[in-house]
């Protein structure tokens, strides 16, 4: 199990600027939070989601592959940091 935060550098308000993922050992997303520039949070888990958030349809690439893409700045985060973002995004929904 690992946790990832990825800052997405762009100017399109329709897309999130932060992507938070909980990953299993094969790098499949278990839970995901998308944070938008206006402060909106969407989330996905299993068959439930808000907004347009969806879990990836394939395993995420290795950290190094994400990091070499100039539009993304990834960092590994702790379970506690992910859970704080998850609680903020889901409120009483999860």
Provide a role label for each language-model segment.
Residues 1-18:
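Short, extreme N-terminal segment that most often corresponds to the first beta-strand
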Residues 8, 33, 53, 71-77:
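Alpha-helical interaction segments
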Residues 9-11, 26, 38, 80:
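Generic structural motif
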Residues 20-22:
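Active-site microenvironments that recognize anionic phosphate/pyrophosphate groups
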Residues 24-68:
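Acidic, aromatic-enriched beta-alpha/helix-loop junctions
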Residues 58-94:
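Short, compact, well-ordered microdomains
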């Amino acid at each position: 199990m690992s946790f990832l935060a990825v800052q997405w550098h762009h100017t399109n308000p329709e897309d999130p600027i932060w992507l938070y993922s909980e990953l299993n050992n094969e790098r499949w997303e278990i839970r995901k939070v998308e944070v938008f520039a206006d402060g909106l949070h969407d989330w996905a888990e299993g068959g439930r989601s808000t907004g347009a958030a969806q879990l990836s349809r394939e395993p995420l690439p290795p950290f190094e592959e994400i990091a070499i893409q100039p539009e993304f700045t990834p960092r590994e985060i702790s379970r506690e940091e992910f859970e704080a973002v998850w609680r903020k995004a889901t409120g009483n929904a999860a």
